[in-house]
Curated annotation (Swiss-Prot):
Coiled-coil intervals, chain numbering: none
Binding site for substrate: 155, 288, 337
N6-carboxylysine: residues bearing it: 150
GO molecular function: hydrolase activity, acting on carbon-nitrogen (but not peptide) bonds, in cyclic amides; metal ion binding
Phylogenetic classification of the source organism: Bacteria, Bacillati, Bacillota, Bacilli, Bacillales
UniProt remark on cofactor binding: Binds 2 Zn(2+) ions per subunit. Can also use Ni(2+), Co(2+) or Mn(2+).
Binding of Zn(2+) 1, residues: 58, 60, 150, 315
Oligomer status and interactors: Homotetramer.
NCBIfam families named among the record's database cross-references: D-hydantoinase
EC number annotated for this UniProt entry: 3.5.2.-
Gene Ontology cellular component annotations, sorted alphabetically: cytosol
Name of the featured protein: D-hydantoinase
Length: 471
């Protein structure tokens, strides 16, 4: 049915204006003032912003890790995302050495099909570069529309790839038009530090942070940037948590390299002291990279403001405190890494960023949606409000105040790392391809409505000035 959103203030990455939006066949059909209401369902957005739907470039739903599986699957995870103002996610498809990439991708399709309530795509993890993998990658891009590959520089003996694998992936990505993503921590040194800590009898959650110091994130980030320069390729550094990594990304961008940086809300508002909470509650805040000392927060905020970091992902990777995080009692290395973040990503950036004057409203939209769409081959179908774009829209009340709590969130976990935090602004209604998923803060979507999205190659949808040194 045709829908007409009236009386809202439309906000994109570049503009703010008052207009009506006419939606037909899942697309934005007309943008204008005082549009004809006949035959349309009218939605009144008085007092609200209308944003492009958020895009979360970093989720781990229904993912095995550390002897267990993340609690949120593609149903609960995408429902929570929708309540938070996200209409598209890109999840990480894990691969196994020696196994065809196609098999891993089929596994991830099976996890999502019939469950997702919003649209989704996949990144592909690269754990080894063999002749078979190199032969399969062009098919992955052409047939599956997967145009981003992730390499882990940490998690020794689990996910970690060596530098040769990273370099060869960068070279292949340049030739194929893909974007390489890295988890940048020095896994070899972390492996040594964690073993030494345990030998010395240090088992508490705080040692997760103390054995993964920011210097090791900075070192790995710099190494990845140098390999990117050598390969003449493109790099996206995920979940940047510290000043040392920001510095290396800024250096690379100032040299004109195609290097991009993502941070996450947890690094903007939480700090290392949370890992010292008594009664093992610090385990709730164990993820990698770890939370840093508080002073890093303003460095990250300034990097978002100045364009040294460009996007905000959630790194959604949720485990229950009881029964899952508790697997690490007596050994911090056994605590499943990750947290439930997907639902609060947009609200935290708006409340702590826009409301507190750290970033502008246009920057906010760019950081949670538009830039991600451009980098990952979704723009202009997604990530903007324009005629012909998917009607992925968030009607957002900027005045509502609420307190984040596990009692009211929609994630399938027994805690929220932002428990008790007051935020201003929240989504009222959320549409994905013109259909309500959330309406008046009530879930009205359907599992299975979400569609798999094939993505364009890196750079195909970006203007030249977007690719290099875009601030």
């Amino acid at each position: 049915m045709t829908k007409l959103i009236k009386n809202g203030t439309i906000v994109t990455a570049t503009d703010i204006y008052e207009a009506d939006l006419l939606i037909q066949d899942g697309k934005i059909a007309v943008i204008g003032r005082n549009l004809d209401e006949s035959g349309a369902e009218v939605i009144d957005a008085t007092g609200c912003y209308v944003f492009p739907g958020g895009i979360d470039p970093h989720t781990h739903l229904d993912m095995p890790f550390g002897g267990t599986v993340t609690k949120d699957d593609f149903e609960s995870g995408t429902i929570a995302a929708a309540f938070g103002g996200t209409t598209t996610i890109i999840d990480f498809c894990l691969t196994n050495k020696g196994e065809p990439l196609k098999k891993a991708i089929e596994t991830w399709h099976n996890k999502a099909t019939g469950k997702a309530v919003i649209d989704y795509g996949f990144h592909l993890m690269i754990s080894e570069i063999t002749d078979d993998v190199l032969e399969e990658l062009p098919k992955v891009i052409e047939e599956e529309g997967i145009t981003s590959f992730k390499v882990f520089m940490a998690y020794k003996d689990v996910f970690q790839a060596d530098d040769g694998t990273l370099y060869r992936t960068l070279v292949a990505a340049k030739e194929l038009g893909a974007l390489v993503m890295v988890h940048a921590e020095n896994g070899d040194v972390i492996d040594y530090l964690t073993k030494k800590a345990l030998e010395d009898g240090h088992t508490d959650p705080i040692y997760h942070a103390l054995t993964r110091p920011p210097e090791l994130e900075g070192e790995a980030t710099g190494r990845a940037c140098q390999l990117t320069e050598l390969a003449g390729s493109q790099l996206y550094v995920v979940h940047v948590s510290c000043a040392q990594a920001v510095e290396k990304i800024a250096e690379a961008r100032n040299k004109g390299l195609n290097v991009w940086g993502e941070t996450c809300p947890q690094y903007l508002v939480l700090d290392q002291s949370y890992l010292e909470k008594p009664n093992f509650e610090g385990a709730k805040y164990v993820w990698s990279p770890p939370l840093r000392e508080k002073w890093h927060q303003e460095v990250l905020w300034n990097a978002l403001k100045n364009g040294q970091l460009q996007t905000l992902g959630s790194d959604q990777c949720s485990f229950d405190f009881k029964g899952q995080k508790e697997l690490g009692r007596g050994d911090f290395t056994k605590i499943p890494n990750g947290g439930p973040i997907i639902e609060d990503r947009v609200s935290i950036l708006f409340s702590e960023g826009v409301k507190k004057g750290r970033i502008t409203l246009n920057q906010f939209v760019d950081i949670v949606s538009t830039r991600i769409a451009k980098l990952f081959g979704l723009f202009p179908k997604k990530g903007t409000i324009a005629v012909g774009a998917d009607a992925d829209l968030v009607i957002f009340d900027p005045t509502v105040e609420r307190v984040i709590s596990a009692e009211t969130h929609h994630m399938a976990v027994d805690y929220n790392p932002f428990e008790g935090m007051k935020v201003t602004g929240e989504p009222v209604s959320v549409l994905c391809r013109g259909e309500f998923v959330v309406r008046d803060k009530q879930f009205v979507g359907k599992p299975g409505y979400g569609q798999y999205v094939k993505r364009a190659k890196y750079g195909a949808l970006m203007a030249d000035q977007d690719v290099v040194k875009m601030s």
